[in-house]
């Protein structure tokens, strides 16, 4: 099934967030960076966006969205073709038992009024959780509004979507290939069910469970009380760098860049 990783978010302390936002390397070489406020018909959020060719990172301050506290984080996925979200929904229903599925249409507030943005699906949380994961299926009205073209075989194109947001074509950041998580037992169980409904395969080695599909991988280590859920993010680069560099941002973020990878560490 054509389910892709789309983006992730991490909630950072203000000092760390501002250090990233003021970095010349981040803004001039690594990625397209912007401070944005997004409004829907039910909520709004404000954060720093680090955009690459195929995926992006949302970095929030505490309270950047309602209920967010430092270290709260999440992973967002997208379907490639219309109707795939319904297939996932049926698979989830057969896996979940008594757990509820949360699904709805997100409507975006734009300069031209309200535009249907994407359908989303997740395992229903009782309240804002420290870790979230969800699936999006972008609405045809929004793709038309932003003039985002599908591929020749009718698939959603992450690069075309990000290009519509004025993402630089010369920045280093290409895609996210790996995310390393520390999750509680219940958080891992819910993520595993969602990934299973996407068609991900899994394997275990020691205390690490790996979930993978195509060129994307998630590694999970189970913890009783993890401080940060997203601990490491491996990004692919468009070109190989000969000189390795390390950048430290505040107390809770570090970026190691070298060869064809950039590795973020949080917490």
Regions found by a protein language model. Name each.
Residues 1-18, 172-183:
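Terminal, regulation- and interaction-focused segments at domain boundaries
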Residues 16, 80-84, 184-188, 237-241:
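Helix N-cap motif at beta-to-alpha junctions
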Residues 18-33, 88-94, 185-202:
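Amphipathic alpha-helical segments
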Residues 32-73:
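Glycine/small-residue-rich interface belts in oligomeric ring/scaffold proteins
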Residues 65-78, 224-229, 241:
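Long, folded non-catalytic interaction modules
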Residues 74-93:
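Long, charged/polar, surface-exposed segments that mediate recognition or autoinhibition
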Residues 90-175, 186, 198-267:
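Vicinal oxygen chelate
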